[in-house]
């Protein structure tokens, strides 16, 4: 699973954005990424749901060239396991301490840094969809309870 993070260290990559394949891009995310690209910050973190409580989610971050030139070495030195949540541990232990002062965080639940555009109903960045393009109803209910 960690191979998908390796382009962050490649010389020919100016910007790398990591997303999960079961999520859909939306305008809220577009506006957030646009704001980050216009900033002087090397790393971007988004958290847009009450369950997005980790420092960095494996499918909701981006980095600019030169921010993590040793990403491959960091991955190789991390004791990898092929289990759910291992990427959260990797980002918490190996990445976040290195980028926490060089990142733009869009997160309305934990850090108070709002997204540049308003929420569209119950849509959120990182929203999961299945093979039938159906979202997870439990995720929507949790979000509804938190935003009123």
Q: Residue ranges of each PLM-predicted region?
A:
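Catalytic core and acceptor-binding pocket of nucleotide-sugar-dependent glycosyltransferases
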Residues: 50-51, 60-148
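Conserved glycosyltransferase catalytic-site signature
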Residues: 1-5, 30, 87-89
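Active-site acidic catalytic loop and adjacent metal/ATP-binding pocket
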Residues: 21
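Conserved donor-nucleotide/metal-binding helix-loop-beta segment in metal-dependent transferases, i.e.
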Residues: 25-56
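Extracellular/periplasmic catalytic domains that process cell-envelope and extracellular macromolecules
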Residues: 9-11, 37, 53-55, 135-136
């Amino acid at each position: 699973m960690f191979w998908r993070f390796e382009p962050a260290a490649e010389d020919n990559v100016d910007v790398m954005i990591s997303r999960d394949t079961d999520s859909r891009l939306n305008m809220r995310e577009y506006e957030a990424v646009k704001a980050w690209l216009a900033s002087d910050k090397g790393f971007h973190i988004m958290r847009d749901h009450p369950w997005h409580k980790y420092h960095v989610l494996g499918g909701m971050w981006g980095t600019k060239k030169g921010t993590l030139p040793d990403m491959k070495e960091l991955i190789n030195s991390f004791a990898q396991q092929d289990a759910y949540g291992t990427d959260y541990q990797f980002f918490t232990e190996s990445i976040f301490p290195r980028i926490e002062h060089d990142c733009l965080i869009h997160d309305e639940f934990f850090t108070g840094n709002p997204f540049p555009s308003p929420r569209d109903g119950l849509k959120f960045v990182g929203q999961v969809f299945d093979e039938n393009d159906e979202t997870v109803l439990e995720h929507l209910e949790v979000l509804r309870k938190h935003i009123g």
